[in-house]
From Swiss-Prot:
Organism of this sequence: Homo sapiens (Human)
Function: Plays a role in interneurons differentiation. Involved in neuronal development and in neuromuscular junction formation.
Zinc finger motifs (C4H2-type), residue ranges: 189-206
PROSITE patterns: ZF_C4H2
Outcome recorded upon mutating R213W: In WRWF; increased cytoplasmic subcellular localization; partial loss of function; rescues partially interneurons differentiation when expressed in a zebrafish heterologous system
Protein name: Zinc finger C4H2 domain-containing protein
Length: 224
């Protein structure tokens, strides 16, 4: 009787070992699948970060182009102001010469009339460009400044976004790896090829339906 009881205990132990072993194998298989999914997601995250870096570099390149353009505009504005100052000085000098020439010509014309000679032609009669009115007209054209066109909203927004991303990136590098805030996972829209959130059902730019690059696997039923 004792032997039978011992045999039954051993059989129960063997059954329990078998059930626990099967349960362990199932958990091991699930664990292996989870690790594979983890490694795959890490690779995708690395790709997303690389793509984000490329986009950031592209935006910063546009910001640098805008900075250089504004620097050139400032240099040209200073050059134009200097040229206008030089033109104003020349105009004042021309006006003084006109003022000196006019009474002298009137005196010469009066002397010529006493001798029965015709008066000399005026400067404007000889050449239009020697007229004081011509120089005044030119001055008005010189002082007309070209209107600077406004920066397109999309380009201005891109420049502002690039600067914000650069500041956020510098702040992020000062944090430890444990508490580092990760950017949201992104993917390329199949229609417009713009970067959108990985889980976005519809592209916010072109309104096309989005399909996830890595669709979620259906959950397995928990083992009883």
């Amino acid at each position: 009787m004792a032997d039978e009881q011992e045999i039954m205990c051993k059989l129960e132990s063997i059954k329990e070992i078998r059930n626990k072993t099967l349960q362990m194998e199932k958990i091991k298989a699930r664990l292996k699948a989870e690790f594979e999914a983890l490694e795959s997601e890490e690779r995708h995250l690395k790709e997303y970060k690389q793509e984000m870096d490329l986009l950031l570099q592209e935006k910063m390149a546009h910001v640098e182009e805008l900075r250089l353009i504004h620097a050139d505009i400032n240099v040209m504005e200073n050059t134009i102001k200097q040229s206008e100052n030089d033109l104003n000085k020349l105009l004042e000098s021309t006006r003084r010469l006109h003022d000196e020439y006019k009474p002298l010509k009137e005196h010469v014309d009066a002397l010529r009339m006493t001798l029965g000679l015709q008066r000399l032609p005026d400067l404007c009669e000889e050449e239009e460009k020697l007229s004081l009115d011509y120089f005044e007209k030119q001055k008005a054209e010189w002082q007309t400044e070209p209107q600077e066109p406004p920066i397109p909203e999309s380009l201005a927004a891109a420049a502002a976004a690039a600067q914000q991303l650069q500041v956020a990136r510098k702040q992020d590098t000062r944090q430890t790896a444990t508490f580092r805030q990760q950017p949201p996972p992104m993917k390329a829209c199949l229609s417009c090829h713009q970067q959108i959130h990985r889980n976005a059902p519809i592209c916010p730019l072109c309104k096309a339906k989005s399909r996830s690059r890595n669709p979620k696997k259906p959950k397995r039923k928990q083992d009883e």
